[in-house]
Amino acid sequence: MQQQSNIRNFAIIAHIDHGKSTLADRLIEYCNALEAREMCQQVLDSMDIEKERGITIKAQTVRLVYKADDGCVYHLNLMDTPGHVDFAYEVSRSLAACESSLLVVDASQGVEAQTLANLYQAVDNNHKILIVLNKIDLPAANPQQVQQQIEDVIGIDASDALMISAKIGLGIKDVLQAIVTKLPSPNGDSQSQLKALLIDSWYDSYLGVVILVRVVDGKIEKGMRIRMCSNNAVYTVENVGFFSPKKQISGVLYTGEIGFVTAAIKQVADCRVGDTITDDKKPCAQILPGFKPNLPVVFCGLYPSDASQFNHLKDSLQKLRLNDASFEFEQESSGALGFGFRCGFLGLLHLEIIQERLEREFDLDMITTAPSVMYKVYLNTGKVIDVHNPADLPEMQKIKSMSEPWVEATIFIPDQYLGAILGLCTEKRGVQVDLTYVNGRAKLVYLLPLNEIVFDFYDKLKSYSKGYASFDWQMNSYKQSDLIKLSILVNGNPVDALSTIVHRSKAEFRGRELCKRLKDLIPAHLFQIAIQAAIGSRIIARETIRALRKDVLAKCYGGDITRKRKLLEKQKAGKKRMRNIGNVEIPQSAFIAALKITNKD
């Protein structure tokens, strides 16, 4: 049993690509947690998608054993967290399990938007902050200027910030020494009843549901009967251990420690992230506060390409939700696509990652509908309803008004790109709140409609600023807007999967653009196909796919013109009849094209 005073629990937080995972690699390497042949880049990024994209998606934990200069052996529980705003929920769960944070800042880039967002979360959790300036070996690094920037922008003392280069291993011992001397040990009563926080869970085909816990009071050991406080489900603990980063069976976890527990849990719904776990025989008197779940902000429909795969998709979504608590889904049906699920995500990257994981890990082939956000619809009757699926929107004459979600966006950019970014924000219906300058960089605060930023705002921001802009946002409020439903009709029949809710000023552009895309993607038939964009009963854009022509005169070598005319009239009548009864098959690529429409001038 390790003394509680010799345990340190800390999270590594930073903006995207400031070196969190590389620093975690160096700490693991220095503590000899893995042999040299087992080390690789981003060793804690276990998913293929993480390695390919070079980003952290899942927060990971590892226990390191470090012998300090004072001769004592310390157990360091490190949690590597994602930097992207779409995975902020992973960060909040990691912070709830720790007492302190390493704030990593790139010495060449300085303070970025997500640096601030993650730091404020850590401060809200009463964390002790240790500032680490990374990449000081780069020619563009300016540690003194970044220290000043941290003090000016964030308002915390950076005079004793640690100077390191995680890539070449410079200053790693200083970081470890600072962790054991400056960061606090966990609080908690080792003699009290068991009280543990459920941080994460995932599904294992052999072990059932595996849960990751932080023991706040007491201890959890093999053979113990544990109870989930949210639903009173009781299980017998089969195995207890920790990650080093390989899985190690210890048989017991004491106060302040972080590790995994298996208990033959088969019900996915029994494990709710943020739940309190206690001893079934001697339950704790008060449950832990947990943490507030992030509400999804982007919604889309997921449908199996083959209807027989519906149950497989349902099982896959349930297993994935166990591993990603910020993702939500509910069953729905569509006239064009059949049975599927309406899913909620924290952003467009989150949507992309979930879709890719479903395809890779569960071998699913799916159709994804256009993303939308949650709107508040005020009816003439006085009732207020939430709508995130355009197909559920009532008729326009029944609607008094509609409100859409607005966000407060914080953007950091070098001065020379300010004009282009101000133009982009104005184009997206933004309202400027604040503009300040710090050491040659501008900090912009804008209010923007969420519907405008979920599609292509981030891509355009990076393009306009040559990749130098950083961006973070948080929900602000709902505001009344002139919103309408844009319907797409193919051959006179509405396709509900392609309908969207848009601002009236953008409706004509989006309708025309979508009709053009569909004209290129829907194959020609033996009859003419009309593709129309409509607002209510008014058509605002139209494209026509010409009919394939069968040459009925091929066998007529000369002869009377009336014979040819008779054959052409017969073909014309047949095409007219076919247009009335024929079905148009819309390929999957047409639905995917709806995602890629950008507001180009």
UniProtKB/Swiss-Prot annotation:
Similarity field: Belongs to the TRAFAC class translation factor GTPase superfamily. Classic translation factor GTPase family. LepA subfamily.
CDD domains: EF4_II, EF4_III, LepA, lepA_C
Superkingdom assignment: Bacteria
Gene source species: Orientia tsutsugamushi (strain Ikeda) (Rickettsia tsutsugamushi)
Main location: membrane
Gene: lepA
Location relative to the cell: Cell inner membrane
NCBIfam families tied to this protein: lepA (TIGR01393), small_GTP (TIGR00231)
Biological processes, Gene Ontology terms: positive regulation of translation
Classification via HAMAP family: LepA
A GO-annotated cellular component: plasma membrane
Gene3D superfamilies in alphabetical order: 3.30.70.240, Elongation factor 4, C-terminal domain, Elongation Factor G (Translational Gtpase), domain 3, P-loop containing nucleotide triphosphate hydrolases, Translation factors
Ligand binding (GTP): D17, H18, G19, K20, S21, T22, N134, K135, I136, D137
EC number: 3.6.5.n1
Domain tr-type G as annotated: residue spans: 5-187
Membrane topology classification: Peripheral membrane protein
Keywords on record: Cell inner membrane, Cell membrane, GTP-binding, Hydrolase, Membrane, Nucleotide-binding, Protein biosynthesis
Protein name: Elongation factor 4
GO molecular function per UniProt: GTP binding; GTPase activity; guanosine tetraphosphate binding; ribosome binding; translation elongation factor activity
